[in-house]
Amino acid sequence: MEMTNAQRLILSNQYKMMTMLDPANAERYRRLQTIIERGYGLQMRELDREFGELKEETCRTIIDIMEMYHALHVSWSNLQDQQSIDERRVTFLGFDAATEARYLGYVRFMVNVEGRYTHFDAGTHGFYAQTPMWEKYQRMLNVWHACPRQYHLSANEINQIINA
Protein backbone atom coordinates (compact mmCIF):
# COMPACT_ATOMS: atom_id res chain seq x y z
CA MET A 1 0.00 0.00 0.00
CA GLU A 2 1.51 3.30 -1.09
CA MET A 3 0.78 6.36 1.06
CA THR A 4 2.14 9.87 1.24
CA ASN A 5 3.68 11.06 4.50
CA ALA A 6 0.57 13.16 5.13
CA GLN A 7 -1.68 10.11 4.68
CA ARG A 8 0.55 8.09 7.00
CA LEU A 9 0.38 10.84 9.63
CA ILE A 10 -3.43 10.97 9.41
CA LEU A 11 -3.74 7.19 9.69
CA SER A 12 -1.24 7.11 12.57
CA ASN A 13 -3.34 9.68 14.43
CA GLN A 14 -6.47 7.61 13.76
CA TYR A 15 -4.82 4.55 15.28
CA LYS A 16 -3.72 6.65 18.27
CA MET A 17 -7.33 7.76 18.83
CA MET A 18 -8.56 4.18 18.45
CA THR A 19 -6.24 3.04 21.27
CA MET A 20 -8.08 5.49 23.53
CA LEU A 21 -11.58 4.70 22.24
CA ASP A 22 -11.17 0.92 22.19
CA PRO A 23 -8.85 -0.10 25.06
CA ALA A 24 -9.63 -3.79 24.53
CA ASN A 25 -7.83 -3.62 21.16
CA ALA A 26 -5.28 -0.96 22.11
CA GLU A 27 -2.27 -3.23 21.58
CA ARG A 28 -3.36 -4.01 18.03
CA TYR A 29 -3.84 -0.32 17.23
CA ARG A 30 -0.44 0.58 18.74
CA ARG A 31 1.19 -2.06 16.55
CA LEU A 32 -0.54 -0.72 13.43
CA GLN A 33 0.39 2.84 14.41
CA THR A 34 4.06 1.84 14.67
CA ILE A 35 3.95 0.09 11.29
CA ILE A 36 2.44 3.18 9.64
CA GLU A 37 4.74 5.69 11.35
CA ARG A 38 7.88 3.77 10.46
CA GLY A 39 6.71 2.67 7.04
CA TYR A 40 7.49 -1.02 7.41
CA GLY A 41 6.67 -2.17 3.88
CA LEU A 42 6.19 -5.86 4.63
CA GLN A 43 3.81 -5.22 7.51
CA MET A 44 2.01 -2.43 5.64
CA ARG A 45 0.84 -5.11 3.21
CA GLU A 46 -1.37 -6.34 6.08
CA LEU A 47 -3.34 -3.14 5.67
CA ASP A 48 -4.12 -4.14 2.09
CA ARG A 49 -6.17 -6.97 3.54
CA GLU A 50 -7.95 -4.65 5.96
CA PHE A 51 -8.67 -2.08 3.27
CA GLY A 52 -9.26 -4.60 0.50
CA GLU A 53 -12.00 -4.39 -2.08
CA LEU A 54 -14.62 -6.90 -3.12
CA LYS A 55 -16.13 -6.14 -6.52
CA GLU A 56 -19.91 -5.80 -6.83
CA GLU A 57 -20.07 -8.86 -9.09
CA THR A 58 -18.30 -10.98 -6.46
CA CYS A 59 -20.64 -9.71 -3.73
CA ARG A 60 -23.65 -10.61 -5.86
CA THR A 61 -22.22 -14.08 -6.50
CA ILE A 62 -21.75 -14.67 -2.77
CA ILE A 63 -25.34 -13.57 -2.12
CA ASP A 64 -26.43 -15.93 -4.91
CA ILE A 65 -24.53 -18.77 -3.22
CA MET A 66 -26.21 -18.01 0.09
CA GLU A 67 -29.60 -17.79 -1.63
CA MET A 68 -28.95 -21.17 -3.27
CA TYR A 69 -28.30 -22.69 0.16
CA HIS A 70 -31.47 -21.09 1.47
CA ALA A 71 -33.39 -22.69 -1.43
CA LEU A 72 -31.67 -26.04 -0.84
CA HIS A 73 -32.61 -26.07 2.83
CA VAL A 74 -36.20 -24.96 2.21
CA SER A 75 -36.61 -27.57 -0.52
CA TRP A 76 -35.05 -30.25 1.70
CA SER A 77 -37.44 -29.28 4.54
CA ASN A 78 -40.40 -29.78 2.18
CA LEU A 79 -39.32 -33.26 1.06
CA GLN A 80 -41.51 -36.19 2.08
CA ASP A 81 -38.42 -38.37 2.59
CA GLN A 82 -35.79 -36.18 4.24
CA GLN A 83 -33.79 -39.25 5.28
CA SER A 84 -32.53 -39.70 1.72
CA ILE A 85 -30.37 -36.54 2.03
CA ASP A 86 -28.28 -35.67 5.08
CA GLU A 87 -29.22 -32.19 6.34
CA ARG A 88 -25.53 -31.29 6.66
CA ARG A 89 -25.25 -31.50 2.85
CA VAL A 90 -27.75 -28.64 2.44
CA THR A 91 -26.22 -26.48 5.17
CA PHE A 92 -24.05 -23.54 4.09
CA LEU A 93 -20.46 -24.10 5.24
CA GLY A 94 -18.91 -20.76 4.35
CA PHE A 95 -15.42 -20.16 2.98
CA ASP A 96 -11.80 -20.95 3.77
CA ALA A 97 -10.18 -18.30 5.96
CA ALA A 98 -6.71 -18.94 4.55
CA THR A 99 -7.50 -18.64 0.84
CA GLU A 100 -10.95 -17.02 0.72
CA ALA A 101 -10.78 -14.57 3.63
CA ARG A 102 -12.49 -11.72 1.78
CA TYR A 103 -15.42 -13.96 0.85
CA LEU A 104 -15.63 -15.20 4.44
CA GLY A 105 -15.56 -11.62 5.71
CA TYR A 106 -18.40 -10.67 3.38
CA VAL A 107 -20.53 -13.62 4.54
CA ARG A 108 -19.97 -12.62 8.17
CA PHE A 109 -20.84 -9.01 7.30
CA MET A 110 -24.05 -10.08 5.55
CA VAL A 111 -25.17 -12.24 8.48
CA ASN A 112 -23.89 -10.31 11.51
CA VAL A 113 -24.18 -6.70 10.33
CA GLU A 114 -26.77 -6.67 7.55
CA GLY A 115 -28.96 -9.25 9.29
CA ARG A 116 -29.46 -11.42 6.21
CA TYR A 117 -29.51 -15.22 6.33
CA THR A 118 -29.44 -15.13 10.12
CA HIS A 119 -31.06 -18.57 10.11
CA PHE A 120 -27.80 -20.02 8.73
CA ASP A 121 -25.81 -21.93 11.34
CA ALA A 122 -22.41 -20.24 11.66
CA GLY A 123 -21.08 -23.13 13.70
CA THR A 124 -18.26 -22.61 16.17
CA HIS A 125 -15.97 -21.16 13.50
CA GLY A 126 -18.29 -18.53 12.05
CA PHE A 127 -18.66 -19.88 8.50
CA TYR A 128 -15.02 -20.99 8.29
CA ALA A 129 -15.24 -24.02 5.99
CA GLN A 130 -11.56 -24.96 6.50
CA THR A 131 -11.23 -25.83 2.81
CA PRO A 132 -11.50 -23.73 -0.37
CA MET A 133 -15.13 -23.68 -1.52
CA TRP A 134 -15.38 -21.07 -4.31
CA GLU A 135 -15.02 -23.48 -7.25
CA LYS A 136 -17.41 -26.01 -5.68
CA TYR A 137 -20.01 -23.28 -5.17
CA GLN A 138 -19.61 -22.16 -8.79
CA ARG A 139 -20.37 -25.68 -10.04
CA MET A 140 -23.36 -25.89 -7.70
CA LEU A 141 -24.70 -22.53 -8.90
CA ASN A 142 -24.52 -23.66 -12.53
CA VAL A 143 -26.70 -26.68 -11.74
CA TRP A 144 -29.09 -24.69 -9.52
CA HIS A 145 -29.61 -21.99 -12.15
CA ALA A 146 -30.56 -24.69 -14.66
CA CYS A 147 -33.38 -25.95 -12.41
CA PRO A 148 -36.81 -24.69 -13.49
CA ARG A 149 -38.14 -24.27 -9.94
CA GLN A 150 -35.19 -23.09 -7.88
CA TYR A 151 -37.12 -22.90 -4.61
CA HIS A 152 -39.12 -26.13 -5.02
CA LEU A 153 -36.37 -28.61 -5.76
CA SER A 154 -36.92 -32.35 -5.90
CA ALA A 155 -34.65 -34.78 -4.06
CA ASN A 156 -33.00 -35.60 -7.39
CA GLU A 157 -32.32 -31.91 -8.13
CA ILE A 158 -30.96 -31.36 -4.62
CA ASN A 159 -28.59 -34.30 -5.08
CA GLN A 160 -27.45 -33.01 -8.47
CA ILE A 161 -26.67 -29.61 -6.97
CA ILE A 162 -24.81 -30.83 -3.88
CA ASN A 163 -22.84 -33.38 -5.92
CA ALA A 164 -21.79 -30.88 -8.61
Swiss-Prot record:
InterPro entries: UPF0304_YfbU, YfbU_alpha-helical_sf, YfbU_helix-hairpin_sf
Pfam families: YfbU (PF03887)
HAMAP family, sorted: UPF0304 (MF_00762)
Family named by the database record: Belongs to the UPF0304 family.
The name this protein goes by in its record: UPF0304 protein YfbU
Organism: Shigella flexneri serotype 5b (strain 8401)
